[in-house]
Each structure stands twice: as C-alpha cells, then as structure tokens.
Amino acid sequence: LAAKFNKKIFIDKTFNEIPSSDIENSKKQKWLEDIIKMDKKELPQKIIDWEKAIFHKVLTAEKNTVIFSHFMVINSIVSNLMESNSIFYFYPDNTSITKIFLEKGKVVSFQIGNDKKTHINL
C-alpha cells in the first residue's frame, strides 16, 4: 500500500493495543473479558485515557490516513462512533476495513467493517 501510493509508513503508538502491561499474562484473558463487559464510566483511568487519545487522534487526522490495528483499538473507535456505553462493540473480521469520513474534525459518516466472531478466546 505504501509503495503503491509512494508514502512512508510510521508507527503511531497512540494506536497500540489496550494497555495491560501491569496485568500478569495468566490473568489477561479474564481481565479483558471484564473490561469488555464494563460500562465506560467504570473503566480504569488508564483505559479511559487510552481510548480518548485514540479517538482524538482519529478526529484530528488532517489527511487521508490508513491505520492498521488490533481489534480493541477498532472497537474503541467504533464504540465512540456509535456512542456506546461499552468499549467493546463488535468482533471485526480479519482484514475488515472500517472507514471514517471527516469534515473539519467532525465525523460526517462512517462504515463499520465486517463483523465476524473470530477465535479471540473471549
């Protein structure tokens, strides 16, 4: 994609997976199951900050942008678009594409990628 459009690729850590470095590996699955069931108001502050940073970055994109990311980042964005009370909205299919159209920092329309319950162990 970068070669086709003669663009450089860079990694923006804003779109890193949900912060969980302080959670023991053996407890991460249960932790994530709990997180996706929570109301956004009940989420740990670091998750709230993570989600706000992601959506802010999306809304302030100044040009056409392609973001490759994890399913929880995609869920965070879509849950904000849908004004959901949960950070978890759907199971994006592998290689699904969600499109967001902005005008002057405002979402004017969006298309959610294919939803498929993939094997995520949740």
Q: Which residues does each PLM region occupy?
A:
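Terminal low-complexity/intrinsically disordered segments and their adjoining alpha-helical capping regions
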Residues: 1-122
